[in-house]
Amino acid sequence: MSLVRRSNVFDPFSLDLWDPFDSVFRSVVPATSDNDTAAFANARIDWKETPESHVFKADLPGVKKEEVKVEVEEGNVLVISGQRSKEKEDKNDKWHRVERSSGQFMRRFRLPENAKVDQVKAGMENGVLTVTVPKAEVKKPEVKAIEISG
């Protein structure tokens, strides 16, 4: 399956739709910007399990490692949060389109019982955050051979 980004001006599905209630809704709801919502929604995170660990990967383009927090809360809950800062604007700038998001994001994951939460490691490279949570070794049941008399 391939995904094709639509960028054709003549394609009605690639254009932003006008919403007559948009301005009414914005005047009633307190000031939260679309960018704040988009930043929260754009914190995409993959979680895979290997035989040794649970690995989380988050695409955080444009976010510095100082702007990201990785924590483990009570109850084996991994929390990845941060903030994507806005660029400084010059009053003479004229924006034609703003698609990159800024604002805060937070994601929570309940870790399984076998997670070693005291040994979590995190690293960031090229805008990708990798969090590794080691798993406790599963004790193999000890088998004791019983001699049969008789």
Curated annotation (Swiss-Prot):
Keywords: Cytoplasm, Stress response. It is found in: Cytoplasm. GO terms for biological process: protein complex oligomerization; protein folding; response to heat; response to hydrogen peroxide; response to salt stress. CDD domains: ACD_ScHsp26_like (cd06472). SUPFAM superfamilies: HSP20-like chaperones. Its main location: cytoplasm. One of its GO terms (cellular component) is cytoplasm. InterPro entries: A-crystallin/Hsp20_dom, HSP20-like_chaperone, Small_HSP. Induction: By heat shock. One of its GO terms (molecular function) is unfolded protein binding. Residues 36-150 form the sHSP domain. Expressed in roots, stems, leaves, spikelets and embryos. It holds the Pfam family HSP20. May form oligomeric structures. Belongs to the small heat shock protein (HSP20) family. This is 16.9 kDa class I heat shock protein 2.
